[in-house]
């Protein structure tokens, strides 16, 4: 016997009764409450010990009340996405970071402290060196990996949003990356630049807030607090 499965779903952004843009699943507003998931395992670093361990971890995420995982800096095996499909977990899929050695003062320290000033910095050719993408071969490698990633994972209904860049790590021409994604898959949302160096495109106004009180103004894109923190929970004996 040969079996198969299918899923019909629609993801969008639409205004609520007050005119505030909300994430929607099948035309109904949904509060996305999730975790930043880098896919580490104590037994094998980036390699899970078993398929059962993957399923158990994802089931625990669901049991804890989360409905979203932002898969950060890693592409998982297909079975990981299969389990997310089955469990009804939404995945925001980051592209794997690349480029040359990062200028941490530019992409981490200054942007955290001077967010309002730095967010609108353009990611065009004059800044590619500061953003660690001065090499044409590096930019071509990113374009190839972007296309391969979308083509490999677009069959999974759990994938709800593509995230081409995170915090300026190897970022360049984010608008072009969004256009490439739209050409390959126009059924998902796109978070053009998670954190900073926002170019005004995609579907998400994506904020990383580690130090300041959160103040959100109405936007033409749906607002997401896609990272926050500096929060620790000390565990005795850990």
Go through each PLM region and give its residues.
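Short, isolated positions in well-ordered beta-strands
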Residues: 30-31
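Short, acidic/polar
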Residues: 47-60, 142-149
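Substrate-binding/catalytic cleft of secreted carbohydrate-active enzymes
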Residues: 68-238
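Low-complexity, Pro/Ser/Thr- and charge-rich linker/hinge segments at domain boundaries
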Residues: 9-25
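Active-site mouth loops of central-metabolism enzymes
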Residues: 40-53, 132-139
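Acidic/histidine-rich helix-loop elements
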Residues: 37-48, 109, 113-116
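Catalytic domains of carbohydrate-active enzymes, especially glycoside hydrolases
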Residues: 53-72, 77
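Short, small-residue-biased leader/transition segments that mark boundaries at the very start
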Residues: 1-8
């Amino acid at each position: 016997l040969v079996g198969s499965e299918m899923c019909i779903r629609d993801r969008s952004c639409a205004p609520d009764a007050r005119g505030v843009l909300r994430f929607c699943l099948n035309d109904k507003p949904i509060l996305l409450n999730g975790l930043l998931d880098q896919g580490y395992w104590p037994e094998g670093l980036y390699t899970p010990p078993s398929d059962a361990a993957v399923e158990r971890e994802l089931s625990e995420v669901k049991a804890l009340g989360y409905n979203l995982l932002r898969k950060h800096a890693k592409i998982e095996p297909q079975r990981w996405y299969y389990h997310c499909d089955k469990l009804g977990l939404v995945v925001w899929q980051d592209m794997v970071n690349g480029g040359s050695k990062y200028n941490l003062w530019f992409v981490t320290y200054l942007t955290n402290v001077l967010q309002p000033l730095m967010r609108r910095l353009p990611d065009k050719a004059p800044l590619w060196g500061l953003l660690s993408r001065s090499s044409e071969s590096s930019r071509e490698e990113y374009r190839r990996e972007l296309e391969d990633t979308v083509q490999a994972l677009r069959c999974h209904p759990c994938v709800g949003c593509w995230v081409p860049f995170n915090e300026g790590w190897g970022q360049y021409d984010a608008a072009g990356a969004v256009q490439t994604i739209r050409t390959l898959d126009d059924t998902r949302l796109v978070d053009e630049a998670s954190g900073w160096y926002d170019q005004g495109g995609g579907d998400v106004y994506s904020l990383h807030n580690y130090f300041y009180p959160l103040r959100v103004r109405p936007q033409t894109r749906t607002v997401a607090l896609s990272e926050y923190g500096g929060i620790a929970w000390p565990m005795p004996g850990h």
